UniProtKB/Swiss-Prot annotation:
Listed InterPro entries: Mntp/YtaF (IPR003810), Put_MntP (IPR022929)
GO cellular component assignments: plasma membrane
Name of protein: Putative manganese efflux pump MntP
Record membrane topology: Multi-pass membrane protein
């Protein structure tokens, strides 16, 4: 696999993380520090790279079992997180219980949900016998960079437009989950 192909693959895999990070940045409001941007982007990048490695090591032997339910895991996680964001957006402006993209549990859930495709890609890379270190590190670094941009962009955009960004973000997460489910059920 040529490096440009690896780069394009990494960009494609990071699009779900971009959507999540834009939403996270919008929710952060005045708490969008460099450290928080790095935290969100790092978790999303590490999960993308890590799931690629896990998928690669599982290889061909487990492909049929993983592919049977990976889309349900991603759908369920994104539906839950999106639903929570929508629910929180309808409540009064209290800070307790609001969607918090810095909460470790929420961030890990988002990391898993947005990197399920990387698991399948890892399995495919094992089939192709592609060099794992190059693939996984490129996927992780690209996802980190795109996610960092997403958090920053979401924060700047969210400050200029006073919308219910929790509601929009929740709908985006549910949309991503639904897209993953439909693709796997009807187009794979």
């Amino acid at each position: 696999m040529l490096y440009i192909e690896v780069l394009l693959l990494a960009i494609g895999l990071s699009m779900d993380s971009l959507a999540v990070s834009v939403t996270g940045g919008a929710v952060l409001k005045n708490n969008c520090t460099a450290g928080n941007i790095i935290k969100i982007a790092s978790v999303l990048g590490i999960f993308q790279a890590g799931m690629t490695v896990i998928g690669y090591t599982m290889g061909l032997g487990f492909e049929k079992y993983i592919c049977a339910f990976d889309h349900w895991i991603a759908f369920t996680l994104l539906l839950y997180l999106g639903g929570k964001m929508i629910y929180d957006s309808t409540k009064e402006e209290e800070e307790d219980g609001k969607f918090d993209p810095l909460c470790n549990r929420t961030l890990c859930g988002l990391g898993i949900a947005t990197s399920i495709d990387a698991l399948a890609v890892g399995i495919s890379l094992a089939i192709l016998k592609s060099p794992l270190l190059l693939q996984a590190s490129t996927i992780g670094v690209v996802t980190f960079a795109i996610s960092a941009f997403g958090v920053y962009f979401g924060n700047r955009f969210g400050k200029r437009i006073d919308l219910k960004l929790d509601l929009i973000g929740g709908l985006i997460l549910i949309g991503i989950g639904t897209k993953i489910l439909i693709e796997h059920l009807f187009f794979s």
